[in-house]
Amino acid sequence: MAGQEQQSSSPREEEHEVADAPVPVPSSPQASAHTDGVDDLLDEIDGVLESNAEEFVRGFVQKGGQ
């Protein structure tokens, strides 16, 4: 096996063509409002977790045979 070279069946010159990246579409006011609502919700969750994460997690822990 020493001295044997493996040859690829496809030539190296043919590289995979890279697809053009999609052009970002300007967001509509409705989409922007939706994103703002999600951001507000995530900020609220972050606030709850920062202030009382232990209590928040305890609410999801199973107790006994529940």
Swiss-Prot record:
GO terms for biological process: modification-dependent protein catabolic process; proteasomal protein catabolic process; protein pupylation. Residues 23-60 are annotated as: ARC ATPase binding. Transmembrane segments: none annotated. Keywords: Isopeptide bond, Ubl conjugation pathway. Residues 1-10 have a biased composition (Low complexity). The modification Deamidated glutamine is found at Q66. It comes from the Bacteria. Pathway: Protein degradation; proteasomal Pup-dependent pathway. Residues 1-39 are annotated as: Disordered. Is modified by deamidation of its C-terminal glutamine to glutamate by the deamidase Dop, a prerequisite to the subsequent pupylation process. GO terms for molecular function: proteasome binding; protein tag activity. There is a cross-link at Q66 (Isoglutamyl lysine isopeptide (Gln-Lys) (interchain with K-? in acceptor proteins)). The N-terminal unstructured half of Pup provides a signal required to initiate unfolding and degradation by the proteasome but is not needed for pupylation, while the C-terminal helical half of Pup interacts with ARC to target proteins to the proteasome. Belongs to the prokaryotic ubiquitin-like protein family. Strongly interacts with the proteasome-associated ATPase ARC through a hydrophobic interface; the interacting region of Pup lies in its C-terminal half. There is one Pup binding site per ARC hexamer ring. Protein modifier that is covalently attached to lysine residues of substrate proteins, thereby targeting them for proteasomal degradation. The tagging system is termed pupylation. NCBIfam families: pupylate_cterm. This is Prokaryotic ubiquitin-like protein Pup. The gene is pup.
